């Protein structure tokens, strides 16, 4: 486990293009404050959408899904889960909300990692908040249907020691400022995934940790644009980058380059989308019709009129109904049910099916 060894990092070939990505991310970070001060209402719209998208995408990557209508109900009014999938979705949202609310209250240590895992599974009967008890493998299904072992993580017996060392190395390098946080954070997440410390939930915990650590160094775009959604949209590249960088990991002969390029690329994509969305919403605020349309576009696949009302407080309910009915006539959305319990569905959206990876969570 050498990704967070300073000598190892110093010998990693960081191409000029990657240096350009780091510089660009620094510029995005520098502009954050301007948006925070000038567009608080726009950010409120984006924040609500990001929480929902992050919860849905991070779970869906691992094949944890519920029907669209039920998902919207769970997000709007958290209730008693009906099955394991619903319980894990609610648990993830709870952990995500805590990170968004007070990221500075978390330490990057074993206790925090175990706590995040425990929160995901808090409403299930699955043992949680503890390291794996049995060795595990990361497998891949080939096109002919056969399964192959892609990577063998750290053994269950060695996991506690590895996790303690991982947290210690990260905190030491962060405190000494030996390298950019945008190198150390993805290196930490990568080693975490290679250790694979849990029997289940590794992928989701890694994404919660990613968001938490980025918040702590003031790269807060994940609060408004779902990092998890961008990962889901590029999950084949995500798995490929992990696969390439994990070659030789046990011997300390691996290259972080593929994983770093992927990680930084996703973060760049989040900032680009953030600035574009803020600009689009600001430019449409002149007309209430356009504002409602933009809000609907940024909502999940299934939504209720109350979701639009919450994000468009300056627009009357009657006006929102007019716009929704117009969008329905245009074939952009359709409705299900009547009255206040009616749900609206965006048309033409296809939900991603479960990927062909097994054991990656």
PLM features per residue range, with description:
Residues 1-361:
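FIC/Doc superfamily catalytic core
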């Amino acid at each position: 486990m050498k990704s967070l060894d300073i000598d190892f990092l110093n010998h990693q070939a960081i191409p000029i293009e990657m240096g350009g990505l780091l510089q660009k991310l620094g510029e995005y970070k520098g502009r954050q404050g301007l948006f925070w001060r000038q567009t608080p209402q726009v950010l409120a719209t984006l924040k609500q959408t990001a929480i929902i998208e992050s919860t849905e995408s991070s779970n869906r990557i691992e094949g944890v899904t519920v029907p669209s209508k039920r998902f919207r109900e769970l997000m709007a009014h958290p209730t008693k889960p009906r099955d394991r999938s619903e319980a894990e979705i609610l648990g993830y949202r709870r952990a995500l909300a805590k990170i968004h609310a007070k990221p500075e209250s978390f330490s990057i240590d074993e206790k925090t990692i175990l706590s995040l895992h425990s929160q995901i599974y808090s409403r299930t009967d699955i043992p949680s908040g503890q390291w794996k008890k049995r060795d595990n493998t990361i497998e891949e299904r080939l096109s002919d249907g056969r399964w192959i072992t892609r990577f063998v993580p750290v053994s269950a017996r060695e996991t506690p020691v590895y996790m303690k060392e991982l947290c210690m190395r990260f905190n030491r390098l962060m405190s000494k400022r030996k390298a950019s946080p945008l190198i150390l954070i993805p290196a930490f997440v990568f080693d975490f995934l290679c250790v694979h410390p849990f029997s289940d939930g590794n992928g989701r915990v890694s994404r919660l940790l990613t968001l938490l650590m980025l918040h702590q160094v003031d790269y807060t775009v994940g609060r408004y644009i779902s990092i998890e959604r961008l990962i889901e949209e590029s999950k084949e590249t995500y798995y490929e980058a992990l696969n390439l960088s994990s070659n030789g990991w046990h011997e300390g002969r691996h290259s972080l380059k593929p994983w770093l390029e992927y990680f930084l690329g996703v973060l760049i994509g989040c900032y680009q989308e953030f600035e574009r969305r803020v600009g689009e919403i600001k430019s449409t605020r002149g007309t209430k019709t356009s504002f409602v349309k933009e809000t609907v576009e940024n909502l999940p696949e299934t939504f209720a009129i109350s979701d639009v009302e919450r994000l468009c407080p300056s627009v009357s309910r009657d006006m929102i109904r007019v716009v929704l009915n117009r969008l329905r006539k245009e074939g952009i959305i359709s409705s299900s049910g009547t009255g206040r319990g009616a749900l609206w569905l965006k048309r033409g959206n296809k939900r991603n099916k479960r990927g062909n990876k097994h054991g990656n969570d």
